[in-house]
Amino acid sequence: MPWIISVALLCTFSSSAICLPEPLTFQVLTVCNFGFFFVVLPGDHLKVCPQGSTCCSQEMEEKYTQQSKHDFRNAVTELSNHLQATFNSRYKKFDEFFKELLENSEKSLNDMFVRTYGRLYMQNSGLFKDLFDELKRYYVGGSVNLEETLNDFWARLLERMFQLVNPQYHFTDEYLECVSKDTEQLKPFGDVPRKLKLQVTRAFVAARTFAQGLAVARDVIARVSAVNPTPQGAQALLKMMYCPYCRGLVAVKPCYNYCFNVMRGCLANQGDLDTEWNNFIESMLMVAERLEGPFNIESVMDPIDVKISDAIMNMQENSMQVSQKVFHGCGQPKTLAQSRPARSVPESGFSARFRPYNPEERPTTAAGTSLDRLVTDVKEKLKQARKFWSSLPSNVCNDEKMSAGSVNEDNCWNGSNKSRVGRALRVILSKTKAGYHPPIKP
């Protein structure tokens, strides 16, 4: 009876040092709510937790070891998942925007050329489809040489145009090959091919690099945040998170500086990644700046139909001079055996002009934003991701589930007992060299 009275008083006035039955302890139940008690044992059997009086069996210590690793992984994953989701959503948004931009550009060109050139364009539409197919293939990572692709497009276009403006002649494949070889020297399309090649090449390289960079960031975060503590790290995590339970201190959380010290050790490899990670972030910001400036893929692709049409007009206007240069270099072609009336240039469908492209017009796609706004948003997220890995230990310990917090050091677990860590540890940590990872043992 005196024992029962003593226990009742203990439950009434102080439950902080009371042990629970093993199953309830593992589930972190409140002792006074259930009235269960566990006999305090000597801790000689414990391998990690303090070996004084304890209410943990060896089996419980092993269970807590697994639970502490689980909690650690969850804490890191919870923080990294947000950043990973940010990069993933921005990658999907940019990818959707870019692909739709290409689709819209191709459709705009097709609609314009059907209205203007009619049957002549439709008979040669495969040439333009091939160009856009190659641009799309490059973006998704295909082995495409953009300069060669554009050179080939203009050479093939010259072959088709040359036959249309000289319908009275018969041209063999060998003759047309001779014509296309001199495309750069003849400059039948004016300066449009040179300018467009420069604009398309640098814009597509920047766009693909940016999209791939966002995907790489997402994947790196997923891999690096999949932490697996070393045996020494697992012991430190157990000692920090669950050894106080073996003392009956189920409501006492680890001291912040103690938590920070352990996390720096357990996340040392992630911290070492920070320099390369920050370099990567800065490189992505540089690409973003280019996308906002002269490498803006939107300002290149939106007017591409007008630019190609202008090139065709230039060829039309200078067809006689171009033809004479070709005849001089490749020889005089044979006339058609059976004569037929030559169609005039206006009838051939090359006479239409289009309104000039206004660079101030920045249409949005179905993705819901222009490239400028999309890149601005990504830049902000990139800046926020700086020093993510080196900040991970402090961010983990800032979680109220992981530590008592930096302002509550009078009532926290320091690795051996409930006490204040004190100013000494803070001084030591503040003087720690940047390249040194403190030991994960307290």
Model-derived features: positions:
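Eukaryotic terminal intrinsically disordered regions
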Residues: 2-69, 76, 275-442
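N-terminal ectodomain recognition module in secreted, GPI-anchored, and membrane glycoproteins
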Residues: 2-3, 14-249, 253-256, 262-291, ...
